[in-house]
C-alpha cells in the first residue's frame, strides 16, 4: 500500500486497526515509517520516506501535442485534469497564422461551446478551469457553460499599460472565468498579496467597532492584524503585462503571451499533488501556462494547432 497518498487522519486509523502504540503524536512521515515497518514482507514496492520529504510516486507527463483541440480533447481521459487554463482566440482579428480569430460571432460561440464541453469532461470533479477573455466576449461565452457548473469572475489588471482607444474607456484589464464542478480547491495562503499602504498605515493594529445592522448590533469590536505573509488574495490580480521594458526579458514572438507570474498564480491557487492529474492547456500558444506548470513541478498537456508555436513552446520548455 502507498501510504504517502493518505492523510494523517487516515494513517492514524490504520495504526488503530493494527493495534499499534505511540502513534497519536507522530507526524505523517513518522506514521508512514511505522506502518511500513509493520507491514509483512511482500513483492509490492513500499513508499520510501527520507527525512521529511515524501518521494514522488507518479511520473511527470509534460508534453505539447500539435493539432486541433476539438480533435485532441476527445482522446483525453475523463476526470483526468486537475487544472485547465484556456486562453482561446478572442475573435478580435489577431493573427495566429490561421483564420481562427475571424469568425462570425454565432460560429465562434458554437465553437467555444464544443471545446468547453470537452474540457469540462476532462476536468476532475474537484478541479478548476480558467478561461481568459475580454469581458464583452466572456459574457457571451459564459452562456455556453452548463448551469450546474459553479463559476466566479475575476480580473487581470495590467497595471503597466492601456489598450489605446480615442473614443472610449482605455482597456486596462482582461477577465478570467473560474469554473469548478463540485468542491473547489483553493490555497489562499499560497497566493497572498502585499498589503496596501493605506491598510498598513491606517488600519493595521487598530480597533474598530462593528457596523450596526451588518454583523451585529454594533456592540462588537474588531482589531485588524496584518498577516505576516500578506493580504488575502483579491479577485483583481495586479500583474504587469509583457509590454515595454517590463516584458523585455520574457517576451517571445506571440501576439497574446501571458506573463509567467500570472500563470503561476492561477496554478498555485488550486494545485493538487502530481498524482491527482495534470494541467491541461487547450490553446498552448506561447507556452506560458505549460512552463508555469513545469516550474511548479506539475504534469501538463498542451495542445497547439500552429506548428511554429509548438516549436516556440518546446524551446521555452527546454530553456
Regions inferred by a protein language model and the residue ranges of each:
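PRPP-dependent phosphoribosyltransferase catalytic core
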Residues: 312-319
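Core catalytic lobe of class I
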Residues: 44, 48, 53, 57-303, ...
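Small/flexible residues
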Residues: 7-10, 20, 30, 194, ...
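The DNA-recognition helices of helix-turn-helix-type DNA-binding domains
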Residues: 18, 38, 286, 296, ...
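Conserved hydrophobic residues forming the short capping helix/wall of the S-adenosyl-L-methionine
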Residues: 15, 145, 317
